């Protein structure tokens, strides 16, 4: 590890080409409102990941942050025959106090985390020891505009060269002229095209980026929504153990419990994490989110190796890392995280999980990875009942031979409706205790879980609950809502609700008068 850190430090001191030494910084420095830096990483067979280009070159990353970015920008397991790029995302804790972040408008970004979008490419090269080279281009930002940042990297790398200094310089120069991000629509010129970005008032607005059921007139520059999920359920569902696992995962996440997504590639892992968090919106997941982690990651952020225990959702590809995280979580949190294995299976995706490993349609098996995996434990408690009509629709679409794009909208709309039904009784209860202060701000009386459960018992909920009898269903209902109200998610949702209501009453959420453009 010390050898690699020294290598990173030496690369940072290595002379840059003249045209990259002192980039012309247009004033104001608009790039810093959107991002921190571009980094090109190269996998050196002798020492591991190393930094090839840091642009702008004067960004004061700490050695520990550069090391974390380098390691996370490469797959831990990679097929040497892979010809297509991998696009994935990860986050690292900001341990670079000398980096000055900037964002004058809401959203202001995150001062504690760096959000990384990455394109990994593997190319044949007979001059290399392993006959191919591996490079990654990474965009580091303090804004979690994952889909938008992925699009920026796609435009920059589609020419066929992943480390072209001229492209880096041109991208930086154009972003330098963009107006700062703010709520609403932005039309942003970028390398010969217009990127249209829509920024919602809060990351947890549901159904971002989903087209309406009635097609509108085609826009010349289709919008990218800042917080829309990356990936698609049309792809992810083919790797699921069963369809009804969607409800298990939904329940785990809405109650702010821990989930580990295990996949063969960082792209599938990070896309699944993004898509899973989307289905519980507008409830913000209050745990730690790590779309992709490697063996060299900082585990204190998820309560391991000395950190404060926190719920988490993480994506990994390393079975040895899985065993380490599960053992540590069981030791510090007292419970095993739910494990979702995403892998190729024979036959169609079953509707529900078969508990026998020997059943002909069972997908309840260990992940097909070197070192094996850990057997999945069926959750001992479940409150929500699967919707049979939706499960049957998903099953029918999955059985079609042709490629489809209808699963994503179906799953996203169904779970958005389920979440709306779930939080409706809470909104109803809060409305009875709503007080407007003299300054016009919303204020709620102290929240009493027993009083709220009595309200749900009186007025009911539209959510379908498990149980053969009404008494069992009432028990499931009370257990579900009591668990939610005691979770971190409840407080993150309530904070979002109050903040948006106050901003709306102050006229800060009005419709924008037009698109913002680059200068």
PLM feature spans:
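Acidic, Ser/Thr/Pro/Gly-enriched alpha-helical scaffold modules and adjacent low-complexity linkers
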Residues: 2-519
